Amino acid sequence: MLPSGIQEFARGIRRRIPLTEAERWVRRDYTPFAFEERARIFRSIARFLHINRPVTGYYLEFGSHEANTMRMAWDSFRHLFDFHYVAIDSFQGLPKIGEIDRQDIWEEGKLCTGEMQFLELCHKHGMPADRLTTVRGYYDESLTEDVKNRFLPKKAAVVYVDCDLYLSTIPVLEFVKNFLQQGTVIVFDDWNCFWADPNRGERRAWREFCERHPELHFEDFVATSMQKAFVYVGDRSGGNGKGSA
């Protein structure tokens, strides 16, 4: 990595070079559109949870590269809810890519933000240290019973799944099952990756999870070009999923 002074000098030079028409479009239209789509998801969740209050507990985030969604969650929820925010990430980038998750955009080690860098970004954004917890490690190793018991019995108000890959999403969904309560919103950030193939990625992991647990009742919530959200309604076997917060 280049020293920070050289990086800043290079950025200054780049800012003085005229943008191409394509670069101007990406900066002016495409990037703000992607940001606004995700912001719409968070505002919709805030509206839903406020109308249906109280739904309290955790904001659980699986995949926290660059702290973008964590900071957006804080901005969207802090004025209305007393959530505790939990970032669960390898902080080493993507794991080794299994055959079922092959797509050109995914590479082992890609999308890496270190834990200290993540925390610095969040704290500079105004998130208090006592409202934010991190859990480090790849999900097939880090989502243990000990970690689960560390956070229970409090439930989740929001679960944000941004782990990209089918093989990463499987352990995430099994982990969060115990944190569901009536009104929990679960969001899939990469719902339409893998060409929206229902047999790939987060779509497949979600379908198989629902097939394994038919007693869990979810309803469609909101969607964008890439994200999809559901609401947990309750247990079909008779429980309503209400829990301690």
Indicate residue ranges for each PLM-predicted region.
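A short alpha-helical cap/connector motif
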Residues: 1-187, 191-245
